[in-house]
Amino acid sequence: MTVFNIDTFDGHIILIDNGKKILLDTGCPYTIGIHDTFDFMGRQHHCFTSLAGFGINDISKLMNYQVDILMGMDLIGQYYLRIEYNSKTVTFSENEIPFQSICTTPIRSNMGAISVVLSVKNENVTLALDTGAKISYIGKKFTHNEVLNGKKTDFNPMIGNFETPIYNINASIEGVVFPVKFGNLPDM
């Protein structure tokens, strides 16, 4: 079990490992870096130098923050993971990590993507758990008639740059209520 310090930038989780800034991205299936391998947790791991035409420098420019590696699910999925925002740490382990929580919820994996079920406006909604996304996205039926709380620019490799309205909406897991900043993906 190894505990790493994390930083956050514009909603992104940045893991610091031996001076390298690593974007933790559960929404990306593959790891991307400048080189085709890198050392992590005492092992050498394969990574792509680009994905869908985007290299790590392109990703850094889109983020306005220089990262050395985007760690995707091909690598994250090899470990148990615990993210603790309050202590600004992330723990990786080859064995299950014991912890206490006010609630637990099943996390599902579908073709390498992680999803979680939230209750939003008394309806269960399955959403992607994407630590690489700075905005959580939900269907327009949930944001209809909500108060607009500004706009944000985001990027999706299949869509490009786009602007989305932002809404603060309460969600819950097992009765634990928390605010979420939701946006809407553009119509495709």
How should these model regions be labeled?
Residues 1-188:
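Pepsin/retropepsin-fold aspartyl endopeptidases
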